[in-house]
Amino acid sequence: MIRSIILLLAIVGVACAPAAATSDDLQTQNPNTTVQSFTPVEGADLMARLEAAKARASSRQTPYWSAYAFDVRSGVAIDPAIREFSGSMNTMGDTTVFVGTTASGMTVETRNLAIFLLRDPASNQITRMEVYNLERKREYSGYPVYWLGRANNEESLNYLRAIAAATPLDQLSERAVLAIALHDDARVADMLKNFITSSPNQRIRSSSVYWMGQVGGQTTFLASLVRNESEEKKIRRSAAHAIGQSRDPGSIPILQGLYESVKDAELRRSVISAAGNAVDEQPAYTFLLGIAKSDPDWQARRTAVRPIGRFKRDDVTEDLMKIFTNDTHLEVKRSALRALAETKTPRALARLSEIARNDTNAELRKTAIRTMGERGEAAVDELLKLFDSEQVPEVKRTVLQALSEIKSERVEDKLFEVAKANQPTDVRRQAIRLLGERVSKRSFEFLSATAQSADGNAEVQMQAVRAISERRSEESVPLLIKIARTHPNHLIRKQAIRSLGETGDPRAIEYFREVLSK
């Protein structure tokens, strides 16, 4: 009876199995190839070409895109074909804006952008607006695209401003503001200011504040927003962030003045965080270090510590260690450890290793271990030594977890060693679980042998079954069925049945039918 209930629950679980996610393959093509696939339309100006597109599309009675290129602001990218990125990302619909650098430190930019307007064929009303990168392959929802060529800035900005101001103020208005901000034109700043001061739509106002920082040269205006106590707090915080993102020289004195004059604690922390992005590194470092050492608000100190590790300075490690040693608040100490990990220096790794071994606070030891794992291959030797010398099982499990984040044959060898060795059961289970996450023939064979052992540790065997269930169904399902049929321990069989129920695999369902029919 118990087994039948388990099987029924397993079958219910099949219906709830999630679909696998797909990933973007970063397909690209020459922008000229993209444009050549569109239908060109002619006209004296942008409005004339929009009318020409309307006339061309009227006979088809299907939604259609009208699209045009424009002069694109430098320092920003839309859906760039990159896999590693450091900076900020903001997504609106199908448009993802990147502001930052590649892994090698190069500014990410995309200059071949176009504004796409999807229209209803009956009313000719715009139902959707996107800014697309012409270097990326797209299907455009299967609708025809009428290409209007390149619009000059004046006609494009005037057209978009009318859309942004039209009622109701909805997603279309917000996309229009984004499109305006992406233009390389001196008039953009005044248009954004107008949205900030007059729009009743808070999303439009917040987006405009963000882009004021990217436009540059607007720190005085942004600082006035931060100081304005009658303004929405979200807008004030966004303005502080925009000052830090502006890359304008001389922003630190402005931020320091705001830090000293603003009374709201949360807003002051936004000001501190903004300093971590400022282009003037020396004054920014001095400002942040002073707050990290002496501000009476521990949350302000923690906020100041976070970005310190990103500064490329010889004295960063020792300054962070002084903060770690002298500050009495646990969260500030944790932030100091995370900042140490970001410095990427051998000296910082040595300090983290020392704390991981010797600190009297177990939570801080574990934090140090986790941050060491973020250092990759450089930390493997220290983590292996730490595991071998450690006596506390919970800390040993933390070391294994940190090691598992590193792609290394030595790490896999260690996981096998621990899984087989005379270690505490919880530690062995941790090693087996982590082996299950490593896709290799060797690890699968080990999990199979462990799960099917007739005289093994039941808890360890159950963990092996769970780990097997995380593998590809081609590997896992036949083995789980075998375990469910033949394992001498009924607890292991039940675990295999539960795991089968979570796979959604037709072979698992057939097995359940077979068993229930008996």
Question: Where do the PLM segments sit?
Answer:
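Amphipathic alpha-helical scaffolding segments comprising HEAT/armadillo-like alpha-solenoid repeats
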Residues: 153-165, 185-198, 216-228, 248-261, ...
